[in-house]
Amino acid sequence: MSDNRSHIEEKYQWDLTTVFATDELWETEVVELTQAIDNAKGFSGHLLDSSQSLLEITEVELDLSRRLEKVYVYASMKNDQDTTVAKYQEFQAKATALYAKFSETFSFYEPELLQLSESDYQSFLLEMPDLQKYDHFFEKIFANKPHVLSQNEEELLAGASEIFGAAGETFEILDNADMVFPVVKNAKGEEVELTHGNFISLMESSDRTVRKEAYQAMYSTYEQFQHTYAKTLQTNVKSQNFKARVHHYQSARQSALSANFIPEEVYETLIKTVNHHLPLLHRYMKLRQKVLGLDDLKMYDVYTPLSQMDMSFTYDEALKKSEEVLAIFGEAYSERVHRAFTERWIDVHVNKGKRSGAYSGGSYDTNAFMLLNWQDTLDNLYTLVHETGHSLHSTFTRENQPYVYGDYSIFLAEIASTTNENILTETLLKEVKDDKNRFAILNHYLDGFKGTIFRQTQFAEFEHAIHVADQEGQVLTSEYLNNLYAELNEKYYGLTKEDNHFIQYEWARIPHFYYNYYVFQYATGFAAANYLAERIVNGNPEDKEAYLNYLKAGNSDYPLNVIAKAGVDMTSADYLDAAFRVFEERLVELENLVAKGVHND
């Protein structure tokens, strides 16, 4: 059973007192922020009174947004560390409600700004040079003009933001707080409570009985609740489609991608290119079956490492290795990594009620915190360098950009994290000459590629399909979702849905389906990271400098322009094809090692 949080050493818990020293200070800030937002209601109708009013109201909005983010970070992270604590559920609800109030109060901002003509805008810039620093901020709003409604309509929608977000919040509570999974046996024969945190480590077990039991226990539980999960997912899809439609977008995908100025062709190119290369995944599945010595490969066999090498890392060992590997970026990067590792930015271990998975979070005025659910595996070492990549991206951006540009597009976010993963792989393959160790590292890389490019593209294809289906009037019942997911899974892995009954329920446990066209960026990011990591490891100092400049750029330019400066053209399929070339090269090396019998040694 997962430990209670009180049993975990303080050094392995994130230090949220650096955000607010006490809960009482958080509550005081909520009261003051609520009053400040109320006071801002008088701005409505006055944004364009003068260049001075445009500057002042813009800066008040940004200041309140900055304070609100800090309030939300504290509440959400307190809740995430133990989702069963009612007090912090209430804190998160208050923070969410305050966001809705803020959005409603400033719903006048964009409609009023868009009444400004180009000539009047230029006059304002001449009168008030301080407005120049917000030029790109304004430019992005002007680009959105065809999709902004009247002030009353935007105010109405802003007031309903909690309703639109309710499906995702219901999913989180159901999945993290209410779901109870059976007791299963681990490889030692010990009975353990199945959790989100230990599921993957059980699926990585070399004991097929352990894998099968955990797999069936997990998905049979989701089977019991499939209709509830279908309703929450359907409601979320309907919300996204509705918001896109009323804002004059052709689809929810167009709406989501346009927020980051990403053309839909990037998404289509990803799915088309990955589908073209699915034979490589089928080939890897055949190799996996051969190495495992199985007559038939099942979905509960796709996570277990092919290597029997004991590449386990305690958390402290993983910290040391990560610092060694990431030193390649130079002193400035290394110094910030050390701070993250020693100043309690990270919440490390599994505990009862803790949110599953891993993430990097925080706001402009906080540390770039990380949530983990640590298991002593090579995969968790990769998770650590991945989340550190996010946190260092956030740190460099906040240090080098004003608040207005002090964040970055999610399209760019996954590049920073997976570049770190690929640098870890490149470094390990350069260091290791022994066949058995190379086998283990290659296996991990191929599994990571499978999980990041193939799997996330499968998710992206499913996500778009259900949005299109809803647009066309299809009711997203559990039966429909199960069938669609099973067919896609068979296409990707080449393993029949008849022989893998339980996998049809996997869609129910994927939180990213509530994030509105997020998952495709894991795949595009990993592919771009493949290219960047090779340049950083084998290139010249200018390549590293270009990469650090990308980390520092934040939202000061459009995402495709920012990453182009680092050397990647995301409008082309070339970066994807380059990634598949690396995958095939490493697959060939693994096939050759298998032919030599390395896996039997």
UniProtKB/Swiss-Prot annotation:
GO annotation (BP), single: peptide metabolic process
Cofactor(s) needed: Zn(2+)
Record key words, sorted: Cytoplasm, Hydrolase, Metal-binding, Metalloprotease, Protease, Zinc
Keyword DNA-binding recorded: no
Major site of localization recorded for this protein: cytoplasm
Subcellular location: Cytoplasm
Gene3D superfamilies on file: Oligoendopeptidase f, C-terminal domain, Oligopeptidase f, N-terminal domain, putative peptidase helix hairpin domain like
Gene Ontology MF terms in the entry: metal ion binding; metalloendopeptidase activity
Listed InterPro entries: OligopepF_N_dom, OligoPept_F_C, Pept_M3A_M3B, Pept_M3A_M3B_dom, Peptidase_M3B
EC number: 3.4.24.-
PANTHER family xrefs: PROTEASE M3 THIMET OLIGOPEPTIDASE-RELATED (PTHR11804), SACCHAROLYSIN (PTHR11804:SF84)
Job description of the protein: Has oligopeptidase activity and degrades a variety of small bioactive peptides, including bradykinin, neurotensin, and peptide fragments of substance P and adrenocorticotropin. Also hydrolyzes the synthetic collagen-like substrate N-(3-[2-furyl]acryloyl)-Leu-Gly-Pro-Ala (FALGPA).
Protein name (database record): Group B oligopeptidase PepB
Species for this entry: Streptococcus agalactiae serotype V (strain ATCC BAA-611 / 2603 V/R)
High-level lineage: Bacteria, Bacillati, Bacillota, Bacilli, Lactobacillales
